[in-house]
Amino acid sequence: MTAKNIRRAYHVIRTALHYGLDDLIPSKLTPWYFKLFRYSFFWLRNQHKDKVGGERLKLAMQELGPVYIKFGQMLSTRRDLLSDEWAEELAMLQDRVPPFDSAIARASIETELNAPIESYFNDFDDIPLASASISQVHTATLKSNGAAVVLKILRPDVEQKVHADLLLMSQAADFLETLLGTNNRLRPAEVVEDYRTTIEGELNLKLEALNAIKLRNNFIDSNALYIPYMYEELCFTRLIVMERIDGIPVSDKVALEAQGTNLKLLAERGVELFFTQVFRDNFFHADMHPGNIFVSREHPNDPLYIGLDCGIMGTLTEEDKRYLAENFLAFFNRDYRRIAQLYIESGWVSPDTDVAAFEQAVKVVCEPMFNKPLDEISFGHVLLELFRTARRFDMVVQPQLVLLEKTLLYIEGLGRQLYPQLDLWQTAKPFLEQWMAEQVGPKVMAAKVKQKLPYWAEHLPELPELIYDNLKMGRNLSKNQNNLLDRYLKHQQKAHKSNYLLITSAILVICGTILINQDATLWPSYGSIGTGIALWVLGWRSRPKNRKI
């Protein structure tokens, strides 16, 4: 770690302690060396004991800046992990940052273009149209044809700042994994890795441009969705240039009503667009919050959505799509055993799961929903409750399904905001039933069999030998499996503990050295170094032996 990273880590830890985030970890889970580190080097008191945990976490992330704010926003959509109260607190985080200097923006744009701005654009506006934590947007007109465009440029040094904070998040997640154990429901390392994938995708504007081009082509003749044109020859990793659109923010219901927009049709089209993207195209916009969705000012009786910011897109495998569609249909048929079987067949939960227990857990969660009329049942909350239940049965995190659930919640919330009487089931059921018929109908099955026949014919003679070899391998494997697994887990536990002690000792020694160089008070400085050396010795002695497992 560089000195800059250590200073950032120190600031993150101080902020977390200032808001009492360490108090949220049960004391029985915190080892003695964590408490020693906390009270020997950080003597801060929790200044926010009067606030609930979710609010404290929100305030800490707000203070830590854009990368943590976006992480909090992502966590707010993970209601399979967090309670509704915590999720609602984090949802209030706002990605608002002041714009950076227009001279820096100009220089960055010219670096990407490898030419002066005036070579490509007229009327470049130095005042940004919008500014966020990752990028900034300016308007201009194309010199070649006079078209109105917007230029989206990454903030200076944003990549280095993001990667530095991601490193700290990963280390914090590993520490929490050590405290909480391998069977914890939160799985912080997986959550941080999911966030890493998302935010690193947002750092590649060329990928956003390619996503937008693909989505635009999928709906090129649609009367429901319009994606602005991307000038691909002017799109790079740190800069993209696209058509400028004129629309009404979808959240501005007053303006939509004022122009006579058919809100019922607009809400229904939003649901249809979601299912079309997921099941027809297998490529869906996964960041459809109101800031990225506009409505055309033309043809209010035949409303047209305009979609922006295609940095985060989702895809599903054919199996995922089929299991998802069957899940929804099984839910509305109140076939809870089929839901349990689908989760096992799909591999989302272990094949060793007790089907009867899983079925009962699903029934307990889902059956009360039918006390409401069908048009009041939320698809997103059905999926959310099923995920929450499955996590109790050790469901493996499926990032693509998390994106889908988040998007579905956005779409539903948006649809019911536009038209409170929206009946999602009535809109979606015909689509799902038609798609299922197309996937599992006799013609489709016959076509799949015909496609596979040459392969099966070629490999059929090998089948008896393969069966025998697999049975023999299974017998041999079962003899050693339990012993190997036990030894491996013990080895990993020792390695995690040793690594944590060694990393903590290094941080303590370096921080103590920095404090001495800054003429800080001697006792915490030398105390930090002494504690660091002691922890290093413990970590070195507790490391696992270098031998085969």
Swiss-Prot record:
Superkingdom, natural source: Bacteria
Domain Protein kinase: 123-501
Any one GO biological process: ubiquinone biosynthetic process
EC number: 2.7.-.-
Chief location: membrane
InterPro entries the record matches: ABC1_dom (IPR004147), Kinase-like_dom_sf (IPR011009), UbiB (IPR010232), UbiB_bact (IPR045308), UbiB_kinase (IPR050154)
Active-site residues from the entry: D287 (proton acceptor)
Cellular localization per UniProt: Cell inner membrane
Keyword Kinase (UniProt): yes
One function term, GO molecular function aspect: protein kinase activity
Biological or metabolic pathway of the protein: Cofactor biosynthesis; ubiquinone biosynthesis [regulation]
Annotated TM spans: 498-518, 520-540
Residues the entry annotates as binding ATP: L129, A130, S131, A132, S133, I134, S135, Q136, V137, K152
Gene Ontology CC: plasma membrane
A Pfam family per the record: ABC1
Protein topology in the membrane: Multi-pass membrane protein
UniProt KW keywords: ATP-binding, Cell inner membrane, Cell membrane, Kinase, Membrane, Nucleotide-binding, Transferase, Transmembrane, Transmembrane helix, Ubiquinone biosynthesis
Residues in the signal sequence: none
HAMAP family per record: UbiB
PANTHER family listed in its UniProt record: CHAPERONE-ACTIVITY OF BC1 COMPLEX CABC1 -RELATED, PROTEIN ACTIVITY OF BC1 COMPLEX KINASE 7, CHLOROPLASTIC
Protein name: Probable protein kinase UbiB
Species per Swiss-Prot/TrEMBL record: Shewanella halifaxensis (strain HAW-EB4)
Lineage: Bacteria, Pseudomonadati, Pseudomonadota, Gammaproteobacteria, Alteromonadales
